[in-house]
């Protein structure tokens, strides 16, 4: 099924339309959009995170899955995060996560602004989600968004490679050096890292 320009789809129509199609798509307010392909570094990070989360999720009766698992974030919006931990009842035929608790997005310079705004708000609006990790692919930096008991969200930036990021719902943790394993990424430059020349005349 080809997507006509500005053709409005329901969630069910969208999921049926993309079944078996090459490429990645998302549904945003009823409109299907093709997603750009990912660089190798992005894919390595996703694989590293998935490798760390799968055994921890299994111990808690949950499932950590890749970007093929959909999240319905609105009545006519479907997202495909890079990694999702779903703690709902197992359903091998399901196309969407029933009770997502952890959502992971790997961002690049071209996607960071959007991922840090619209998608984040959508993920935080899902009642079962209590942790969102936004991982930079080009520098060593992870933004950790946690839902507190009062319903409010906190944000923490983690940049130290040996720092643990706690995953309370899985009773586990992950370090930056696990996330960026095999990749040559560095922390973001600090002001003192730049040499500032003398002022001009």
What are these regions, as identified by a protein language model?
Residues 1-201:
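Gly/Pro/Ser/Thr-rich low-complexity, intrinsically disordered segments predominantly at protein N-termini
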């Amino acid at each position: 099924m080809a997507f006509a320009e500005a053709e409005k789809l329901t969630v069910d129509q969208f999921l049926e339309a993309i079944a078996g199609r090459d490429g990645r798509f998302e549904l945003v307010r009823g409109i299907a959009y093709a997603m750009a392909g990912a660089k190798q570094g992005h894919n390595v990070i996703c694989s590293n995170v998935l490798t760390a989360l799968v055994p921890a999720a299994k111990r808690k009766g949950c499932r950590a899955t890749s970007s093929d698992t959909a999240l319905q974030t609105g009545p006519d919006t479907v997202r495909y995060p890079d990694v999702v931990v779903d703690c709902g009842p197992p359903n091998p035929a399901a196309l969407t996560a029933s009770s997502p608790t952890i959502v992971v997005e790997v961002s690049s310079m071209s996607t960071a602004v959007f991922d840090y705004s619209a998608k984040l708000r959508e993920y935080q609006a899902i009642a079962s989600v209590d942790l969102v990790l936004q991982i930079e692919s080009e520098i060593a930096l992870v933004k950790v968004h946690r839902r507190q008991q009062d319903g409010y969200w906190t944000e923490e930036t983690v940049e130290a490679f040996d720092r643990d990021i706690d995953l309370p719902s899985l009773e586990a943790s992950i370090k930056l050096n696990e996330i960026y394993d095999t990749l040559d990424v560095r922390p973001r430059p600090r002001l003192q890292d730049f040499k500032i020349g003398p002022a001009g005349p």
